[in-house]
Amino acid sequence: MVRSEFEEAKNSFDYSLFESRRKKLYKELDKFVKRYTPNAILKLSLREYVQGHGGQDTFTYHVERTFDELGTISGSYCSIFGIFYSKNKSQYSFPPKWGDTPKAALKSILESIVDLIEAGAERDTKRIIDNQLAPMYKGKLLSLYYPEVYLNIFSDEHLKYYLHFFNQTSGGILSKDPVLKRER
């Protein structure tokens, strides 16, 4: 899309078509953030966190699917969440960096999520970058908890595209961590 096409699309866009949907979505987001406080996150069970058991009322389902319109990470591998339930194998799968058992892995992942949320509140970029969660997952969580601070674009290639498009390429930003590219 060239700049003139973008300007034309922007000028002819009818915001009223999605305004009510957006309001409902942000009401749901407010409920999500109030439900999943750092303390509540630390108490999640495997079934309350992980997709794969068939239910839709899990933390990861809400992050990925309920708020898809606020930035999509759908289509990513389930491993983006650190741990997932494989119906084919009837077991949990997770990389060894998170722990030796599903419970240990979950505990580590939940602690990382809480650390990320706290680092996002403090705008502690170093802690956010150092956090072991998958980059796209970190981006989605930060944009849900702090939508006024962190952009809801999770692909590094898309971030680079929009930085170029809007002439925001000074200071070597294109070669920096995606976290730095997402900060508003």
Predicted features by range, described:
Residues 1-135, 148-184:
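An N-terminal alpha-helical hairpin/helix-loop-helix interaction module that forms a charged
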